[in-house]
């Protein structure tokens, strides 16, 4: 008894609410076998022929392709598109595709070469010898999608049902009027359909396979039973004819008695459904190694002279199919892609065949009836009685028409399968399906925008978090750097203190200090001389901006220059004398040497500034200056030269006085030679300054003033010579410390270098003076100047000869 109940339950069929029984009109096309059509002049292949994203293009215009060659590639829901024949890719451009909106999409255009050559195939006879994932990958690479009308990628559907599916349903109902593509396919290729069903069952590891077919297809039922024979792995279930029994949820309810939950999928209840055409395409992809390049299309309608089913290559224009079917267009002729209830009218016949194209309907005007105008809803509830999804079409109509998206969503408009049963029974001729499709599209756009906004928000928040993390990382890095620097500074300070303590404990010899101080003094003197030389060059290159000057202003500027020179000379004289008074007996020799070098540099700069200041006034003065100003300028120049010589001699004698407490004969001799050289240079500088004044233009000089100026110059030169003699004799009297010959040699070399530089400077100053213009020189003044120069030279030579 229990076995009889199980057998009864296994063969039992259920029913769904609603549904209609429209005229079938299938006998127009199911009586002739499948036939092939010649190739069109051009193929148009849309990149997107399925639910999902379009793949990446793998060819370029001008490429030669073979049949079955992939033109695009991708993963997941990005199904590839294959070349329907061999030929050349002519272009890649937008073109109108099979969609109710008639929008243009990106398409590949192929010009066939007529050879129809296949690419290399990869057949697999024993599919049970490979992994199931490999079979799913092959299905994806073949570009197989749902051929029943939805166009969902088959590989993605199989991958989602690899676990938990115990029932596989092969949908052979084909309930919509006029369409006979699956019917004719089962009649002509029943064995291949069953083999594809077995491959799908093997991939899913399904416990049972149910083939649901309506009872209005006796030839197809007979062909399937004949091909099945005595096999028990597949079960053929003949169901009553009722529209829309071919819907996924409706057929699942009929064969299993289970209902797919709202918002869920059939896999949630352990059921997965595939179309008859999809099973045939899977067999071709696995066993034969052929990708999806063609499908069965029904050509029917009273406007077609030769209705039937044909093998149509993907990308074939609809006009090419109708042309070979004897299409006779009438007045206001319409052509529908799909059935009369779920199809849509084509905007043009250039639309290509795609993977979801199952029927081309070209009805006559009498066949479709008159196009009656839409009227107001009378609330008859006939649409609710006919709805197979148990919805409220009337309420959905009001919400869709009023744009109330929230209410439409709340009334489960997403569960509408757009079967058209409500519109078929509506007495007011309201195109309800049109409203529902538009409302679904608007809701989808709103959801997409919300998803993009959420994604943008998440990206913004992620960016903010990343910036905060980077900021915290930088702050931590800076803190670590500060700590490391502080620790390193502390270590360096401690190490320096230890070195100082060790040096103080061990003691440092004075000889090393002397060597270091001598080197530092030489370096400081060299740097000072370089700076002075650069200053001279800069002063020489500066142009004279004032061409004319008032005599009164010239006198004022000369007085200011004399005052500045006097202060500079006093500072230079005071700087070397202060150091010995302030320095303690314990000062290091290095400090004394550095102070002496600094004093010499300052004295030299002061002397150069003094020489430059009196010479500027005569250059800037007009040729109309009086002779008295020239005499005054000469006297000022001689006075500044004398002060500069005294400062140089004082700076030269200070270093030995401070750093030589004990007498050394060799150092004394070197110091004496240095003093004589400096005295000689000072005398030469005095003579040059004395001779510069007469060379300046003095058109009306007075003999008395010239004599006075000469006497003053002789007296100053005599004082300079006496000062030089005194400085030369003082050096040997100073006690010299015990020093080694190396230091003496270094000191002598330094003295010779300084003397040489001073001589060169004196020669340069002497040669520059004659170059000055003296257009109105007096012979008497020239004679007086020559006598003064000879007297000064004689006085300078006498002390030096006595010392030698």
UniProtKB/Swiss-Prot annotation:
GO terms for biological process: electron transport chain. This is Ion-translocating oxidoreductase complex subunit C. Belongs to the 4Fe4S bacterial-type ferredoxin family. RnfC subfamily. The lineage of its organism: Bacteria, Pseudomonadati, Pseudomonadota, Gammaproteobacteria, Enterobacterales. Its cofactor is [4Fe-4S] cluster. InterPro entries: 4Fe4S_Fe-S-bd, 4Fe4S_Fe_S_CS, Ion_transpt_RnfC/RsxC, Nuo51_FMN-bd, Nuo51_FMN-bd_sf, RnfC_N, Soluble_ligand-bd. [4Fe-4S] cluster 2 binds at residues 387, 416, 419, 422. Residues 484-495, 567-582, 592-619, 629-660, 668-693, 706-731, 744-769 have a biased composition (Low complexity). Part of a membrane-bound complex that couples electron transfer with translocation of ions across the membrane. Residues 366-397, 407-436 form the 4Fe-4S ferredoxin-type domain. It comes from Erwinia tasmaniensis (strain DSM 17950 / CFBP 7177 / CIP 109463 / NCPPB 4357 / Et1/99). One of its GO terms (molecular function) is metal ion binding. The keyword NADP does not apply. The gene is rnfC. Its EC number is 7.-.-.-. It is an enzyme of class 7 (translocase).
